[in-house]
């Protein structure tokens, strides 16, 4: 559950319904064949689910219930703002300088005017693109590789896993904080992301006979569409 933020709540909902509609299609079979590590993945999926149910989801529910919505929005904006330079770099690597400039502009505007707590840049017409290294590698022609479920982080692939590990290593919050501060920052980030995903729980539980396959298919479809559709308008979260 924790890794869904990778492609946005609204987009995950669209991908989830597509996964349900295509559950018995040749595409679903092809995606199943892209999961040679399924026994291991299912074991990690079970671990993640247990951890989520015992710790992360209850904390996220309390967070959503007791923290005012404007403050939660500000926290989410702050997290997203820290990712803008990374998105700009990936746009450059993909040969999209205009989007890179937009990302840098978003970072500067939101940082200067709101310390990253607001998103006035969107009001100025600078839309968030949300690029990552996994998408860059896909644009460069690297295949997704086998589907992976990462401990705590959730659904991924070999290609996206490389991108996510690289992003963690070069996370800017690591450079400006101590080990304990970074751990606290990461915990807040996880809880905030999980709180945003709470509305998706009922959709998945009611629509999926096999939650593992449902989430895998939705993830793979969404990631592929992100790579194929990058010539269109910037991402809107």
Residues of each region from the PLM?
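Beta-rich strand-turn-strand
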Residues: 72, 76-78
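N-terminal targeting signals for Sec/Tat export/insertion, comprising classic cleavable signal peptides
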Residues: 38-62
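Second-shell loop/turn segments in exported
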Residues: 41-46, 65, 73, 89-99, ...
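A structured, mid-to-C-terminal "fold-capping" secondary-structure block
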Residues: 31-32, 135-237
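Mid-length scaffold segments of soluble, non-membrane domains
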Residues: 81-158
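Membrane interface segments of multi-pass transport proteins and intramembrane proteases
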Residues: 54, 59-70, 125, 134
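N-terminal signal peptide c-region/cleavage motif recognized by signal peptidases
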Residues: 25-26
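Bacterial N-terminal signal peptides that target proteins for export
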Residues: 2-16
């Amino acid at each position: 559950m924790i890794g869904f933020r990778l492609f946005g709540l609204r987009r995950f909902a669209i991908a989830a319904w597509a996964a349900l509609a295509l559950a018995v299609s040749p595409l679903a079979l092809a995606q199943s064949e892209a999961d040679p590590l399924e026994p291991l993945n299912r074991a990690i999926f079970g671990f993640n689910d247990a951890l989520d149910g015992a710790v992360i989801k209850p904390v996220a529910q309390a967070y959503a219930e007791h923290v005012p919505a404007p403050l939660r929005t500000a926290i989410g904006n702050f997290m997203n703002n820290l990712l803008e330079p990374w998105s700009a770099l990936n746009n450059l690597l993909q040969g999209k300088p205009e989007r890179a400039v937009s990302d840098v502009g978003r970072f500067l505007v939101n940082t200067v005017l709101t310390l990253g707590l607001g998103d006035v840049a969107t009001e100025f017409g600078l839309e968030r693109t949300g690029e990552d290294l996994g998408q860059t590698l896909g644009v460069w022609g690297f295949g997704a590789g086998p589907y992976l479920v990462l401990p705590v982080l959730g659904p991924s692939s070999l290609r996206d896993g490389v991108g996510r590990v690289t992003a963690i290593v070069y996370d800017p919050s690591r450079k400006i904080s101590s080990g304990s501060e970074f751990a606290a920052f990461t915990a807040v980030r996880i809880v905030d992301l999980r709180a945003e995903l709470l509305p998706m729980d009922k959709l998945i539980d009611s629509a999926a006979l096999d939650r593992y396959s449902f989430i895998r298919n939705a993830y793979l479809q969404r990631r592929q569409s992100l790579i194929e559709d990058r010539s269109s308008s910037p991402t809107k979260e």
